From Swiss-Prot:
The lineage of its organism: Eukaryota, Metazoa, Ecdysozoa, Arthropoda, Chelicerata. This is U1-lycotoxin-Ls1v. Residues 1-20 form the signal peptide. It comes from Lycosa singoriensis (Wolf spider). Keywords: Disulfide bond, Knottin, Secreted, Signal, Toxin. InterPro entries: Spider_toxin_CSTX_knottin, Spider_toxin_CSTX_Knottin_CS. PROSITE patterns: SPIDER_CSTX. The presence of a 'disulfide through disulfide knot' structurally defines this protein as a knottin. Disulfide bonds join C44-C59, C51-C68, C58-C86, C70-C84.
Length: 107
């Protein structure tokens, strides 16, 4: 009976050690993934910044990704140029307002 307990204890120790090694590998992979996501986040264009040259590079807001919103600007010379900025579309603003109000009510 004592031999069985010793063997079971050894097996449990080996299994826990091997699973902890696997977890360490997973944590290293997650750390690399998080670093890559952070790098991507740094490269995105923040809210209210110009996105004329990169219309799909806006960052994420609280709930939605910001959209590149463009307007045509007419200079004093009569030249028309397109200027774009990252912002929250009106329907996203409304959805965020409803969600924020719901959170306040539900606590």
């Amino acid at each position: 009976m004592m031999k069985v307990l010793v063997v079971v204890a050894l097996l449990v120790t080996l299994i826990s050690y091997s699973s902890s090694e696997g977890i360490d590998d997973l944590e290293a992979d997650e750390l690399l993934s998080l670093t890559a996501n952070e790098q991507t986040r740094k490269e995105c264009i923040p809210k209210h910044h110009e996105c004329t040259s990169n219309k799909h590079g806006c960052c994420r807001g609280n709930f939605f990704k910001y959209k590149c919103q463009c307007t045509t600007v007419v200079t004093q010379d009569g030249e028309q140029t397109e200027r774009c900025f990252c912002g929250t579309p009106p329907h996203h603003k409304a959805a965020e307002l409803v969600v924020g109000f719901g959170k306040k009510i539900l606590g």
